[in-house]
Amino acid sequence: MTENEQIFWNRVLELAQSQLKQATYEFFVHDARLLKVDKHIATIYLDQMKELFWEKNLKDVILTAGFEVYNAQISVDYVFEEDLMIEQNQTKINQKPKQQALNSLPTVTSDLNSKYSFENFIQGDENRWAVAASIAVANTPGTTYNPLFIWGGPGLGKTHLLNAIGNSVLLENPNARIKYITAENFINEFVIHIRLDTMDELKEKFRNLDLLLIDDIQSLAKKTLSGTQEEFFNTFNALHNNNKQIVLTSDRTPDHLNDLEDRLVTRFKWGLTVNITPPDFETRVAILTNKIQEYNFIFPQDTIEYLAGQFDSNVRDLEGALKDISLVANFKQIDTITVDIAAEAIRARKQDGPKMTVIPIEEIQAQVGKFYGVTVKEIKATKRTQNIVLARQVAMFLAREMTDNSLPKIGKEFGGRDHSTVLHAYNKIKNMISQDESLRIEIETIKNKIK
């Protein structure tokens, strides 16, 4: 990369980071690469699904950086992984395989879902370690963390990561013997082979894999069928002894897999255990920003933030909400999804879901004011003495954390402030909490009083 290209690209990244939320930047921009700038055309490598976002949101960024560095209008040519792989794949055709061919082994269908990749997995603080471990395993299967055990509640991305690992390994080594399977289906296959008296086929199928991806391993603990856990134990040992990678997911930690044999639990803890927790507000906004690219509707920012505030337990609820909205919008022939339209569309889903305690913003303001010795009137006003500013920002932080109100709505309740003011207060307090233990305790104390 030439010096001008480096300056240009650094400026693009700087402008993008200043305009986007951190989680959105991490997902859509962080992994993009500038390949070259030639004849006023910037060739940028990125994941294909992110092209539309760049076209919609970053065109001005590229134009600005172009005029600053080259004093010219820079257009963009996006290239994708598939384009870069053509030459590499052609080279691989003429190369000898690194491992001995296994033509004598039965064919294995991977059952991977090709739509899941690391590129379209939204990262946040709640899943960062799980993603890092998954990428490490995909890069060097059988050597880094074996087994890798990922646990967390439903709809948080465990299945996505399993498939992303498999797809990444398959892209690098098309001859790899990979199997994605749920524990329930493993049990079903075991039963079928027992009945047909073809257990040797099952053993040959699973014990000669390069990568075994087992989803919802807790299902194995529920089964009392004689021999099921024994067969999985032997499969695990055969693979692990041959340095073949095993990745498992569960809705609980290995130690809480009741009715599972101790020797299996022990083996599950040989490698690395990582947890995924529900996405925070910023990550939910980033997830929605990504998902709405699949729909031909306009989602204003306040609608996205409203939806992010409505569902905080898992990603599936967010995806389901978008499908509900799409149905209503198509029926009404609406292009722009307002907060009112979104609220109408998800009403039934909210009624079916867990009931949330509605916390008035006024209650938050009152409790914060009482704690810091200021009035609600002062919190809503413009006075900027230190104790009032802190109370105001803490109240805004808690209003965003503890209610499903959009940023504009919260701002309105704080003397008609702009949504950007609320966002600034939220980010500032969030950052302060990470560095100031006493402030974190203060806010937890206020939270407990509000609840």
UniProtKB/Swiss-Prot annotation:
Identify the PROSITE patterns for this entry: DNAA
Q: What organism, scientifically named, is this protein from? A: Streptococcus pyogenes serotype M1
**Which portions of this protein are annotated as coiled-coil regions?**
none
Keyword DNA-binding attributed? yes
Q: What family, per the record?
A: Belongs to the DnaA family.
Q: Which terms are listed as keywords in the entry?
A: ATP-binding, Cytoplasm, DNA replication, DNA-binding, Lipid-binding, Nucleotide-binding
Official protein name in the record: Chromosomal replication initiator protein DnaA
Q: Which GO terms describe its cellular component?
A: cytoplasm; plasma membrane
An example GO biological process term is: regulation of DNA replication
**Its quaternary structure?**
Oligomerizes as a right-handed, spiral filament on DNA at oriC.
Q: Where is this region: Domain IV, binds dsDNA?
A: 330-451
- What residue spans carry the region label Domain II? 77-110
SUPFAM superfamilies linked to this entry: P-loop containing nucleoside triphosphate hydrolases, TrpR-like
**So which residues are the signal peptide here?**
none
